[in-house]
């Protein structure tokens, strides 16, 4: 168990529920998600996603936001099944049961930031093209970015950038 409370982000499966920050005192708090939880490490972001180990067996709803974030942050995971049920995001400490804080900048991006735009690039070295849609949340932008990569073969790379709110 950790010696101090750490900041985590809950990503609810139900899209209408907002992401929220939580304070966890240790691994037992993660186990409140389910009787048996499994980690999904996202090394590029130094975080771990925890979810119900029996997510599909229990017919839990797909977690589009967590699945999109994993696919955007870890391109190798794009061929893996979607994540289901609520997902708890914690800082990765390199240990199986020790947990750390989600990086502060990432908490801001996920919970407090926005709006965001998605940019695409056809080939390395080519100019980036800003797509016309503005997304209120980072998770919405990540979903759109992954769709661009999967459904538009001319797109070789995508990135998400925080942008200014459109003038009213």
Regions from the language model: what does each represent?
Residues 76-102:
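Ordered, amphipathic secondary-structure segments that act as subunit-interaction surfaces
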Residues 1, 165-168:
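Short intrinsically disordered terminal tails
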Residues 18-45:
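Amphipathic alpha-helical packing elements
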Residues 30-37, 134-159:
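A short, charged, amphipathic alpha-helix used as a generic interaction element across diverse proteins
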Residues 95-115:
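Surface-exposed beta-loop interaction hotspot
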Residues 108-129:
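Short aromatic-glycine-(Arg/Gly/Cys) micro-motifs in beta-strand/loop hairpins
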Residues 1-19, 24:
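Short, extreme N-terminal segment that most often corresponds to the first beta-strand
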Residues 45-75:
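Short, structured protein-protein interaction patches enriched in aromatics and acidic/basic residues
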């Amino acid at each position: 168990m950790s010696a101090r409370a750490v900041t985590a982000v809950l990503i609810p499966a139900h899209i209408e529920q907002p992401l929220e920050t939580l304070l966890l005192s240790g691994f037992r708090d993660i186990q409140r998600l389910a009787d048996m939880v499994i980690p999904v490490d996202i090394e590029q972001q130094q975080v771990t996603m925890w979810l119900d180990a029996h997510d599909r067996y229990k017919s839990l709803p797909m977690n589009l936001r967590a699945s999109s974030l994993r696919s955007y942050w870890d391109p190798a995971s794009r061929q893996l099944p979607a994540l289901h049920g609520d997902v708890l995001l914690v800082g990765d400490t390199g240990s199986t049961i020790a947990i750390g804080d989600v990086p502060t900048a990432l908490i801001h991006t996920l919970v407090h930031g926005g709006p965001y735009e998605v940019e695409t690039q056809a080939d390395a070295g080519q100019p980036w093209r800003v797509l016309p849609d503005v997304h209120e949340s980072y998770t919405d932008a990540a979903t759109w970015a992954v769709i661009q990569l999967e459904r538009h073969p001319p797109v070789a790379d995508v990135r998400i950038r925080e942008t200014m709110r459109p003038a009213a």
